[in-house]
Amino acid sequence: MKAIKIAIDGPASSGKSTVAKIIAKNLGYTYLDTGAMYRSATYIALTHGYTDKEVALILEELEKNPISFKKAKGGSQLVFLGDEDVTLAIRQNDVTNNVSWVSALPEIREELVHQQRRIAQAGGIIMDGRDIGTVVLPDAELKIFLVASVEERAERRYKENLEKGIESDFETLKEEIAARDYKDSHRKVSPLKAAEDALIFDTTGVSIDGVVQFIQEKAEKIVDMS
């Protein structure tokens, strides 16, 4: 049976990572968390105090401490920078609020997109991000673009933070998500937008199971036809 490439894009907290992980497990595919890669680069910049004028230093640190993914005992995915487990560190609010400017740096995107494409070559992979269908995997057999209201996405992020023990204010989260939407969709390099051949799905009020079912049925149909 042919293994396809699945690209899931959308704004912050639209449910991309959650559904991508479930579908990858259901189909036996590899899940690549591209957002974690950009967050890792952001973590490096913040930890060392690097600015957008010091891209070479960020890339140097990425080379010395490459990004890797490992599975935890419970099946969850751990993110490492070299030997350092940064799984929780890259989800902190300071990283979330700075990832847009780091991910907009052309040199950072070029390096990480190169890594992502190399991993995806064999197929049987599902990636989520903001430019997977448009830039990283324009040849993906299935492209999905998830959207949801700012209110709902803020609610999701608030609940996620509670579960991780991260303090946050709901109204502040709404403002931050709206601001990030603007930054991501207006950046010069790989702006957030749906690929022309992507299926746009509004997840507002839709359960995770409902979104998973929609995407998985589309994927299985493509595989059956190939």
From Swiss-Prot:
Main location: cytoplasm
Entry binding sites for ATP: G10, P11, A12, S13, S14, G15, K16, S17, T18
EC class: transferase
GO cellular component: cytosol
Cysteines paired by S-S bonds: none
Reactions catalysed: CMP + ATP = CDP + ADP; dCMP + ATP = dCDP + ADP
A GO molecular-function annotation: CMP kinase activity
Keywords: ATP-binding, Cytoplasm, Kinase, Nucleotide-binding, Transferase
UniProt protein name: Cytidylate kinase
CDD domains the record matches: CMPK (cd02020)
InterPro entries to which the protein is assigned, alphabetical: Cytidylate_kin, Cytidylate_kinase_dom, P-loop_NTPase
Superkingdom field: Bacteria
GO biological process: nucleobase-containing small molecule interconversion; pyrimidine nucleotide metabolic process
Keyword Cytoplasm belongs to the record: yes
Gene3D superfamilies reported in the protein's UniProt record: P-loop containing nucleotide triphosphate hydrolases (3.40.50.300)
Family, similarity comment: Belongs to the cytidylate kinase family. Type 1 subfamily.
EC number: 2.7.4.25
Pfam families: Cytidylate_kin
Subcellular location: Cytoplasm
